Amino acid sequence: MDGGLRYDLTVPLSRYYANHANELPSPFKALQMGNVWRADRPQRGRFRQFMQCDIDILGEPSNLAEIELILATTALLGKLDFKNFTIRINDRRFLKAMAAYSGFKEEDYDSVFITLDKMDKIGLDGVAAELKGNGYAEESVEKYLALFEEITNDVEGVRLCKEKLQGYLAPEAADSLEMIITSVESQKEAEFKMSFDPTLVRGMSYYTGTIFEISMDEFGGSVGGGGRYDKMIGKFTGQDTPAVGFSIGFERIVMLLLERGYEVPTSKPKKAFLIEKKLPQEKLLEVLEEARKEREAGRQVMIVNMKKNKKFQKEQLAEQGYTDITEVYNG
């Protein structure tokens, strides 16, 4: 029998959820730490065995999952005294739309994205040379790279993509990404920048939508990342389940923390906001603001969409320790 070492925590979590979904709350919020392995060449901050610290939300189809994960991860980094880092964010649907718009065939997307992922190392000219060297039409390559020169790294860049990629990019994908960026920017606790990066690819082929990475100048690269993987659990159950995760490299963070001192904050009673589905962004921002204040006060806070069987949902929350529950309605 062939054997292998665990590559990440996402696949095992998906398998666990697939086997126990009926016993778990929905959405299911998981926090885990564990060792994983890579066939990498060891160097500063890069190891063949290292520990990942993951937070995931399974069963939540809306972008509330992305907003919560990014806010939670960046709040943690802020409490560890990290400042002026960048959350680079993109969406796999943007990558595919830009490739289609430029004339690349769908079967060539993976190859094109592998080259695009080298943008930080070889630059625009290097990417152009490699794509042409791989036999892609010069017209497609030039049209493709012209997009990256035109698109800005903010919400205006997202809006430009929505306008320019009509017929290739679903408008709701652009609207969702813009909402994530603006919501996080308005509610963030730490000092960091949200940057729309249309060149961000991330290597995991299982991502289906939003993808993001944490970049720190003092490290010279990424210290964490994640994204949406709505098709993963369906491989085990036959039914797709929405899921988003964010992972931080423990050793990389500790390596940077060794230069400073830090004390773990004490925890206080848990609080849950039970919100009506399809809550307007303005109302959602109010909830996120209140949750931020509660977290600043040292409380563990959960925001979850209201279900039809509210009584059972509250019982589940109580079992998880959320005894202080606030219901939020549109009106």
Predicted regions, residues:
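Acidic, His- and aromatic-enriched active-site or binding-groove loops in soluble protein domains
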Residues: 1, 104-127
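Short, conserved phosphate-binding/catalytic loop or strand-edge motifs used
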Residues: 47-53, 89-97
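A residue-level structural signature of the nucleotidyltransferase/glycosyltransferase Rossmann-like core
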Residues: 2, 86-87, 245
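Positively charged, Gly/Ser-enriched RNA/tRNA-binding surfaces
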Residues: 8-21, 30-82, 131-331
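Short secondary-structure capping/junction motifs at helix and strand boundaries
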Residues: 22-31, 81-87, 106, 110
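Short, surface-exposed recognition loops or helix-turn segments adjacent to catalytic cores
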Residues: 84-94, 112, 195-201
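Hydrophobic mid-domain F-helix/FG-region of cytochrome P450s
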Residues: 74-78, 94-101
